[in-house]
From Swiss-Prot:
GO terms for cellular component: cytoplasm. It holds the Pfam family MTS. Its EC number is 2.1.1.174. Its main location: cytoplasm. It catalyses: guanosine(1835) in 23S rRNA + S-adenosyl-L-methionine = N(2)-methylguanosine(1835) in 23S rRNA + S-adenosyl-L-homocysteine + H(+). This is Ribosomal RNA large subunit methyltransferase G. Keywords: Cytoplasm, Methyltransferase, rRNA processing, S-adenosyl-L-methionine, Transferase.
């Protein structure tokens, strides 16, 4: 893999989760453009720089030791990549601490560097949280590859920060440079809420939660077919989002024990709040993580999963395949993984490579619900 070579540092970076024969590198031309733009300013070492949505540490590690860096984002995997890449490049793994997007920012900041996320609601929430956190003379610079840069990103910067100047494109990347101006305090539209009839619950959704405006159609197809009569089983909601699968299952299985895990900190925050609202003081483990990577082997009886098919702008079934492998490792012999997936993704054949038996529980014209027994 090529090195990230900028005026600040030369870095050897890896993506997360790691894959054999990884076809993608851990940085892109937008990272290079941002770093070169900052280098041209010859900023003193005491400059306070906030990095938002750094994929795997490309920006924060490059700047470490050159300015005072804080880094925040909504991805557990990105922070895992930050730690591993710090070590890989001769720095202490805790030289930089990733601040989850669910936690407040503490400024003031002289420069803010933003990688524009796939979910613009996350960008909007982050810009709102910058209110009162920018030092006099601050600059906010957002970057993306041109093909992933919607006009709405510039509109959000202008609404919440100030006038925006778009750079020329360099290596198919572009910068949006915002000059802060006095603004009336903005009220965040997040979290959003919606109600379900069956089960009768209200679900809260922070900005980066998948389908935060309403239940996605895959989950809607899955809910009537969740397993019942689980007794005191150990159940995991893998990639839990706002926690709806675990909550619906728990309402039907009062003695079961639940673990909810997602790599999005905002999803985990939403799931924890929704669990408390629906189930009160009933205990559950709700955590951010790399799926079931930290789960003890053969410690679960049931895994529920609506697997994702993208990581930011990267589309593919590699995350789903990894989740299936993790579920197999975590399940007891005889335990079962229940999933919902688009018909065209062919999950049945993939699961058959890992599990003793795979059966179709239900189907709609678009989705299948599958049960895979270890």
């Amino acid at each position: 893999m090529p090195l990230l070579d900028t005026p600040f540092a030369q870095l050897d970076l890896i993506r997360q989760p790691e894959q054999q024969n990884e076809p993608l590198q851990a940085f892109d031309a937008a990272d290079e453009y941002l770093l070169n733009h900052l280098a041209e300013q010859n900023l003193p070492i005491e400059t306070r720089v906030l990095v938002l949505n750094d994929s795997f540490g490309a920006l924060a590690i490059s700047l470490s030791g050159n300015v005072q860096v804080s880094t925040s984002g909504d991805s557990f995997l990105a922070f895992q990549g930050l730690e591993k890449n710090l070590l890989r490049n001769g720095q202490a793994f805790d030289a930089l601490r990733g601040i989850p997007a669910s936690e407040p920012l503490v400024g003031p900041f002289d420069r803010v560097l933003i990688r524009v996320p796939k979910t613009l609601a996350l960008l909007e929430e982050q810009l709102i949280r910058l209110q009162g956190q920018l030092a006099p003379g601050a600059q906010v610079v957002a970057a993306a590859m041109v093909k992933h840069l919607p006009r709405a990103a510039g509109d959000l910067l202008e609404r919440y920060i100030g006038p925006v100047q778009a750079s020329l494109a360099v290596k198919k990347a572009r910068l949006l440079i915002a000059t802060p101006e006095a603004k009336a305090p903005a009220v965040s539209p997040y979290p959003t809420r919606y109600r379900l009839d069956e089960p009768a619950i209200e679900l809260l959704n922070h900005a980066n939660v998948f389908c935060r405006e309403g239940l996605d159609i895959g989950t809607r197809a899955f809910l009537p077919h969740l397993p019942k009569n689980l007794g005191a089983a150990g159940v995991a909601d893998l990639g839990c989002g706002n926690g709806v699968l675990a909550i619906a299952s728990a309402l039907q299985n009062p003695d079961a024990h639940y673990t909810l895990v997602d790599e999005s900190f905002m999803a985990v925050q939403s799931a924890a709040e929704n669990w408390r609202a629906a189930l009160g003081e009933r205990e559950a483990i709700v955590r951010a993580g790399d799926g079931l990577a930290g789960q003890e082997a053969q410690s679960l009886d049931v895994v529920l999963c609506n697997p994702p098919f993208h990581q930011q702008q990267v589309v593919g079934d590699f995350l789903a395949w990894r989740m299936f492998q993790q579920a197999r490792e975590a399940l007891v012999v005889g335990g079962a993984l229940y999933i919902v997936g688009n018909r065209h993704l062919g999950y049945h054949s993939k699961l058959a490579r890992l599990f003793r038996g795979v059966e179709q529980v239900a189907a709609t014209p678009k989705f299948v619900i599958l049960k895979a027994r270890k």
